[in-house]
Amino acid sequence: MINLIFFNIFLLYKMVEKVLATYFEDKIGMRDNDLYDGGMYYAELSNDPKKKDFKALGGLKNGHKLKITYNGVSVIASKGDVGAGGPKHPKIDLHINLAKALGFTNGLDYVTIEDA
């Protein structure tokens, strides 16, 4: 009974985290996917830019949907790419179309992410 209750609570849990973000303008994603096909995409960056592990968000699967919020504006986006990251250690890279939809004009700022 305890295990069933714990499992149900686990299912209700949603990851909500404030993370440092940047944006990028690449045309092709990690699987040769077109990042300008009308979708909204993000790239998961690396914990250490030199190691390129692409797991700053825990190693999300390609296509994983996140609700990304910036200054009160939210957009659902899919993981469409990965990246090394940069010197200030952002965790997520917003594709330029997603950044525009969010009003994300700063090169480096915080966004809130949660599973969609």
Give names to the regions the model predicted.
Residues N8, Y13-A116:
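Secreted/periplasmic proteins
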